[in-house]
Amino acid sequence: MKGVAALLMMLLVTATAVAGASCDNDSTGNVTGHREMRVRVDTVPATDSLSRYTGLTDADFEAVAKELDVEIAAIKAVVLIEAGKQMKGFWAPGVPVVNFDRSMYNSHRHKAVNKKGDKNAKVPAGLTGYALKEWTQLTNARRQNEDGANMGTFWGMFQIGGFNYKLCGCETVGEFVKLMSESELEQLELFAAFITNTGMLPDLKAKNWSAFARKYNGASYARRGYHTRMANAYAKFKK
């Protein structure tokens, strides 16, 4: 993948029953380098069961944490706050957790390189409740402007906005979505690239939760308690 030199775009995560987190879209950060390492998912079972996509092991966390020179407990703290107690990145096989944001879609649909819609887009089968609601909104938007819809959605266990696809080391938002839909291991890799390329990694290394949460979750992080929640989560996993 080609290198990226760009400013961190705004990251917004709407409050959800799954992630239990929200943030504002007014944070910025500086790109300090480009991370290209990608862990492939060649060892997952061939069957299309949920276990094919979920189930990060301690070894998975350890491999990425070692490369980033950051504590495993620090990474897990972010997962807990962004993905909730279940710490999962998928609602069903091949169906990642998403949060569609209409304001972000309206902003980014005009910026999409490919503004075509996918008239054949379908809502994944078997979803209910909040998952069905979010995927229905995303699918309806995809029928109008597929790339814009993907850019205006927050993806996976780390709730990374699709508009940040380049900062995750992807050439296109389509590639970003494909990787997000492959496994939690790929979601972890995308997160690692994201925090490296946006300059957030030093804050996570130092466990400077205020600085990290301000960049990751926006200026209202303190009012929403992101920094204290991450600190408490870190303490939990550090035991």
Where are the regions a protein language model picked out?
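N-terminal secretory targeting signals
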Residues: M1-G55
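Catalytic glycan-binding domains that act on GlcNAc-containing polysaccharides
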Residues: C23, D42-K239
